[in-house]
A protein has these predicted regions:
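Conserved beta-loop-beta/alpha segment of the NTase-like Rossmann-fold superfamily
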Residues: 128-203
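Short amphipathic alpha-helical interface segments
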Residues: 1-25
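ATP-binding glycine-rich phosphate-binding loop
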Residues: 329-353
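Conserved core of the sugar-phosphate nucleotidyltransferase
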Residues: 46, 177-256
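A conserved alpha-helical element in kinase catalytic cores
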Residues: 356-385
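Conserved alpha/beta core of the MobA/IspD/sugar-nucleotide pyrophosphorylase nucleotidyltransferase superfamily
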Residues: 12-15, 58-73, 225-322
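N-terminal glycine-rich phosphate-binding loop and ensuing alpha1 helix
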Residues: 8-12, 26, 59-130
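A short, conserved structural fragment
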Residues: 41-51
Length: 385
């Protein structure tokens, strides 16, 4: 992470910050900040006016920031979102609303506010539902033909050209950020992180004193974990994507998250998936620590219902409304929803009401063309007798 570049960025965004405020914004000590300010003044990156307490970027600072200007963003939106059924039977997870605003739209607006207009959405499941965004937000859509049976490692492989030679954010369509954490300039690759107290099954980070990622392990306790957006610098992508491509072409990696490639590089375990290959350089990536209540990754419908009360009793979902009517209970009492494997002609899920388990089956289009329901009933009746 170029700390002088980061200092110049903060001055660019707010030229009247105190050194204490600068230190907090950069997640460094006040003493380190004092040293950096002196270094920046000596190198004529910026000047300081003691009368009004303001900084001014000089040509050197402007030139330094030019190398770190953001080029683009890629938003992952190809998956089904099985833990959000029945909502995702009708709507991709990223198009679900939180407090009346679609999660993916909120992120696009935040990116635009930061001066990042070039946005690509990687689509798959219900891809046509994202087409309105081409005109509304000027985004590009990239189709992932393997979305239905492979994981995010494959998604990044298909989107790899969006990263090469560019400074690019990587976002998940179903994340929700309270405050805008994107910038016009980024001074080093990073992964957003939140602190998890107690035991967690998240991907836990090991870092150096300066915040450089040195290791990743799945599960731990009282740890900073991978959570939210990621920034891929040009330099990071140049080293990372050749390894990811090797993984993609290796059998047995189909269900991997892309983060597994990064974890293997940091942990020195690439040869566990690519036998005999140890020559890959480790790309530098830093932790970007976020405060509590800033980044949200909703793991399931229950978490979303706790966060946005609208989903407790009025989800605007046909299946939940029907269950509510048939069983004569408010939607808030429909719990324990779990997706069942989708059949040829229908979609099904388990749920509970007052501790009793039920199955809801939603007939799909073409059901009556494939199945004669009268004949099916006659067969069932004959079996019973």
């Amino acid at each position: 992470m170029d700390r002088l570049g980061l200092l110049c960025r903060n001055i660019y965004e707010n030229n009247k910050m105190t050194q204490r405020e600068l230190a907090a914004a950069m997640d460094i000590s006040l003493g380190t900040c004092n040293h950096l300010v002196k270094e920046g003044l000596d190198q004529e990156l910026f000047s300081f006016d003691p009368v009004d307490g303001s900084y001014s970027l000089l040509k050197g600072g402007v030139d330094l920031l030019r190398n770190y200007r953001m080029d683009s963003a890629v938003i992952l939106a190809a998956g089904f979102g099985s833990r959000f059924v029945p909502l995702t039977f009708e709507t991709p997870k990223g198009l679900l609303e939180v407090y009346g605003e679609r999660m993916i739209e909120r992120q696009i607006k935040q990116l635009h506010e930061a001066g990042v207009p070039d946005i690509t959405i990687v689509v798959g499941y219900l891809k046509e539902t994202f087409e309105y965004m081409i005109d509304k937000f000027g985004v590009k859509l990239l189709y992932n033909p393997e979305y239905h049976n492979k994981n995010t490692l494959t998604t990044l492989y298909h989107a790899r050209e969006c990263f090469i030679g560019r400074n690019t954010y990587l976002l998940s369509s179903d994340n929700w950020m309270r405050n805008n954490m994107y910038h016009t300039y980024e001074c080093g690759a990073w992964y957003s992180s939140v602190y998890m107290k107690g035991e967690t099954s998240e991907w836990c980070l090991e870092t150096s004193k300066k915040g450089l990622l040195t290791g990743v392990k799945v599960g731990g306790e009282d740890s900073w974990v991978m959570y939210g957006p990621v920034f891929f610098s040009k330099e990071f992508s140049e080293k990372f994507f050749p390894v990811l491509e090797e993984y993609y072409h290796t059998p047995g990696t189909e269900q991997m998250y892309w983060e597994q490639v990064l974890a293997d590089l940091l942990n020195g375990e690439v040869d566990s998936h690519l036998p005999g290959k140890h020559h890959f350089p480790v790309p530098g990536m830093y932790v970007n620590r976020q405060p509590d209540n800033q980044v949200y990754e909703f793991e399931n419908l229950e978490e979303l219902r706790l966060f946005d009360e609208r989903y407790r009793n009025h989800s605007d979902n046909i299946a939940r409304e029907l269950i509510s009517q048939v069983l004569q209970v408010p939607e808030s009492e429909i719990t324990g929803i779990k997706c069942l494997k989708t059949g040829m002609t229908n979609k099904s899920f388990l749920f509970k009401v007052h501790g009793k388990s039920y199955i809801c089956r939603i007939p799909g289009p073409g059901t009556e063309l494939l199945i004669n329901r009268k004949q099916e009933k006659a067969v069932n009746d004959s079996v019973k007798t």
